């Protein structure tokens, strides 16, 4: 048996709140959880993600250490 009076209170219907709106309910030790970003408004999950870095990391590494010429079309 678990020891009495050492465990935090459990809230099986804790509300997750984003921008003043309840977005889901979960089990937690807090009655309300305020978040700024959740899967419903995160760019990765909504499909509005923007690609900022158009240069590949490998190409940048190879060029930085002189293993790739400036014209990478010859090697592709």
Curated annotation (Swiss-Prot):
Gene: rpmE
Protein name from the UniProt record: Large ribosomal subunit protein bL31
Cross-referenced InterPro entries: Ribosomal_bL28/bL31-like_sf, Ribosomal_bL31, Ribosomal_bL31_A, Ribosomal_bL31_sf
Biological-process GO terms, alphabetical: translation
RNA-binding is among the record's keywords: yes
GO molecular function, one term: structural constituent of ribosome
Subunit structure and binding partners: Part of the 50S ribosomal subunit.
Gene3D superfamilies reported for this sequence: Ribosomal protein L31
Cited function: Binds the 23S rRNA.
Family: Belongs to the bacterial ribosomal protein bL31 family. Type A subfamily.
Statement: the UniProt record of this protein carries the keyword Magnesium: no
Pfam families xref list: Ribosomal_L31
One CC-aspect GO term: ribonucleoprotein complex
Keywords linked to the UniProt accession: Ribonucleoprotein, Ribosomal protein, RNA-binding, rRNA-binding
Top-rank taxon, per record: Bacteria
